[in-house]
């Protein structure tokens, strides 16, 4: 079985191939997310604690968190589920995934170093790979440098150096800070609120005018009906009087 071990503190990961079955028994019947003491893997692993992050079986099917079996199952997956990437909007698909329990049929096991031991492991804990990009969101930059709301975040942005080309001076590039509160942002917000209030007032006035117009139209229609009723009653009286005069 191969062990793909990553160490977030240095940003490194390394693939180890373990042939001895006895060394791997410490991982068997363990679930994803469980912490394992790695002393049995060798002297250089003494004191290390590893968390099981996932893995693939010998046919390439991935482990899925929450599936409490060591075998393979077919699940109906949709957007947001692990082990599946939808190609169309709203698409669902039945996919074969492996349970979250480790057994001997695993090909690769993904592990994360939670606690470093006594010795360094070459290529994993002795070298540090610097992050290519720094944080972009204003709140995360504040969290990284422990800044208050009064501090200017723009001075603390991690700039990325660009190599010099065509006999030009080397430059650096900074990301656009997201969710940064500036006077322009506040101005736009106040404008949005003012427009919303203006629309509300205009809507209230329009509804009041419509209510007045509705009352006026009802009065007019009522007056028309009463006028028509009077005319009908007057014409009926006239017809009755003409009939009675003819009889005489």
UniProtKB/Swiss-Prot annotation:
Keywords: Cytoplasm, Nucleus, Phosphoprotein, Ribonucleoprotein, Ribosomal protein. Residues 223-248 have a biased composition (Basic and acidic residues). Residues 215-248 are annotated as: Disordered. Pfam families: Ribosomal_S6e. The keyword Ligase does not apply. Ribosomal protein S6 is the major substrate of protein kinases in eukaryote ribosomes. The phosphorylation is stimulated by growth factors, tumor promoting agents, and mitogens. It is dephosphorylated at growth arrest. One of its GO terms (biological process) is cytoplasmic translation. It comes from the Eukaryota. It is found in: Cytoplasm; Nucleus, Nucleolus. GO terms for molecular function: structural constituent of ribosome. The modification Phosphoserine is found at residues 233, 235, 239, 242, 244-245. Its main location: cytoplasm. One of its GO terms (cellular component) is small-subunit processome. Belongs to the eukaryotic ribosomal protein eS6 family. Component of the 40S small ribosomal subunit. Plays an important role in controlling cell growth and proliferation through the selective translation of particular classes of mRNA. Part of the small subunit (SSU) processome, first precursor of the small eukaryotic ribosomal subunit. PANTHER family: 40S RIBOSOMAL PROTEIN S6. Component of the small ribosomal subunit. Part of the small subunit (SSU) processome, composed of more than 70 proteins and the RNA chaperone small nucleolar RNA (snoRNA) U3. This is Small ribosomal subunit protein eS6. It comes from Drosophila melanogaster (Fruit fly). The gene is RpS6.
């Amino acid at each position: 079985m191969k062990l793909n071990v990553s160490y977030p503190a240095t940003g490194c990961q390394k693939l180890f191939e373990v042939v001895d079955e006895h060394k791997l028994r410490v991982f068997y019947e363990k679930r994803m997310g469980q912490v394992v003491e790695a002393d049995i893997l060798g002297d250089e692993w003494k004191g290390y604690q590893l968390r099981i992050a996932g893995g693939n079986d010998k046919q390439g099917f991935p482990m899925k968190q929450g599936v409490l079996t060591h075998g393979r199952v077919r699940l109906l997956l949709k957007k947001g589920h692990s082990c599946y990437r939808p190609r169309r909007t709203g698409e669902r698909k039945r996919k074969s995934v492996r349970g979250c329990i480790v057994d001997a049929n695993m090909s690769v096991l993904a592990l994360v170093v939670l606690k470093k031991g006594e010795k360094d492991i070459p290529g994993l804990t002795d070298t540090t790979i610097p992050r290519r990009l720094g944080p972009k969101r204003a709140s995360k930059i504040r969290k990284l440098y422990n800044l208050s709301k009064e501090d200017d975040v723009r001075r603390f942005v991690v700039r990325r150096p660009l190599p010099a080309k065509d006999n030009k001076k080397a430059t650096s590039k900074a990301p656009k800070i997201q969710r940064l509160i500036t006077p322009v942002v506040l101005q736009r917000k106040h404008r949005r609120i003012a427009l919303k209030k203006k629309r509300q007032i205009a809507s209230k006035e329009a509804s009041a005018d419509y209510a007045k117009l509705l009352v006026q139209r009802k009065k007019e229609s009522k007056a028309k009906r009463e006028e028509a009723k009077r005319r009908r009653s007057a014409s009926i009286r006239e017809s009755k009087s003409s009939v009675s005069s003819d009889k005489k």
